[in-house]
């Protein structure tokens, strides 16, 4: 199998395989926050993120969500379909938290009557700015039909995820998704789903996600291990 490095990101390396339509995602032990301003090597993080994301993507595939995930092939690696990533972070918020609370001057933890979908332009140089539908079209990132699909699919995924996490006593506060075009030009879910790109709170309001690292609240891998163990109880 070819192992040529295609791309090195903050949390993952993307490697080529002998099949031009398939890549390997290698999960690193690196933790970052604030667009890479805060950075630390945390042993075991890559294994946990790969386990959690593989588990979630397998369940999403089984539920009929089209994703890039093929299979987990080692503790830190998984096979994915190669996609052309859409340069958008699609964020869904079920509760107020993080940048949303800061932007609108509201306390964290308020349940939103209707989940809110937001777009952020994937551009590190610009610090991934918050943009609206018209900006998305102006930048020729997606058209009206594609924007509608991204929102609808994100809401569908939210219903599945929220139910699964509710089963294990965790609130899905918010999360970030990325999508891409497969070789047929179909939009499918890509990237990962782990505590790196979502907020999870337990019944006491404790953070069970990367906010533990962002805010210096404890050992990240201890929290991720608890999430991983809880996930085993999902039906």
From Swiss-Prot:
GO biological process terms held by the UniProt record: 'de novo' IMP biosynthetic process; cobalamin biosynthetic process
Pathway(s) where this gene product acts: Purine metabolism; IMP biosynthesis via de novo pathway; 5-amino-1-(5-phospho-D-ribosyl)imidazole-4-carboxamide from 5-amino-1-(5-phospho-D-ribosyl)imidazole-4-carboxylate: step 1/2
E.C. designation(s): 6.3.2.6
Pfam families the UniProt entry points to: SAICAR_synt
InterPro entries with a match to the protein in the record: SAICAR_synt/ADE2_N, SAICAR_synt_PurC, SAICAR_synth, SAICAR_synthetase, SAICAR_synthetase_CS
Gene3D superfamilies: ATP-grasp fold, B domain, Phosphorylase Kinase, domain 1
CDD domains noted in UniProt: SAICAR_synt_PurC (cd01415)
EC class of the enzyme, as a word: ligase
Keywords noted in UniProt: ATP-binding, Ligase, Nucleotide-binding, Purine biosynthesis
An MF annotation (GO) of this entry: ATP binding
Reactions catalysed according to its record: 5-amino-1-(5-phospho-D-ribosyl)imidazole-4-carboxylate + L-aspartate + ATP = (2S)-2-[5-amino-1-(5-phospho-beta-D-ribosyl)imidazole-4-carboxamido]succinate + ADP + phosphate + 2 H(+)
Membrane-spanning ranges: none
Record family assignment: Belongs to the SAICAR synthetase family.
PANTHER family (UniProt xref): MULTIFUNCTIONAL PROTEIN ADE2, SI:DKEY-6E2.2
Protein's name according to its UniProt entry: Phosphoribosylaminoimidazole-succinocarboxamide synthase
Primary gene name: purC
């Amino acid at each position: 199998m070819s192992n040529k490095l295609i791309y090195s990101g903050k949390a993952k390396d993307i490697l080529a395989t002998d099949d031009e339509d398939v890549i390997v995602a290698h999960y690193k032990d690196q933790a970052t926050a604030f667009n890479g301003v805060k950075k630390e090597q945390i042993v075991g993080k890559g294994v946990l993120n790969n386990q959690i994301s593989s588990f979630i993507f397998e369940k999403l595939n089984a539920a009929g969500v089209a994703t890039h995930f093929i299979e987990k092939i080692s503790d830190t690696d998984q096979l994915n379909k190669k996609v052309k990533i859409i340069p958008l972070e699609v964020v869904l918020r079920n509760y107020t938290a993080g940048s949303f609370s800061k932007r609108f001057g509201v306390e964290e933890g308020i349940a939103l009557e209707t989940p809110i979908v937001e777009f952020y332009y994937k551009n590190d140089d610009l610090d991934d700015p918050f943009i609206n539908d018209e900006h998305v079209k102006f930048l020729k990132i997606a058209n009206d039909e594609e924007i509608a699909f991204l929102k609808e699919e994100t809401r569908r995924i939210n219903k599945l995820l929220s139910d699964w996490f509710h089963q294990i006593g965790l609130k899905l506060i918010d999360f970030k998704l990325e999508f891409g075009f497969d070789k047929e030009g179909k939009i499918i879910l890509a990237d990962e789903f782990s505590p790196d790109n979502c907020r999870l709170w337990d019944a006491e309001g404790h953070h069970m996600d990367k906010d533990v690292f962002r805010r210096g609240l404890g050992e990240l891998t201890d929290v991720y291990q608890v999430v991983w163990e809880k996930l085993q109880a999902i039906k």
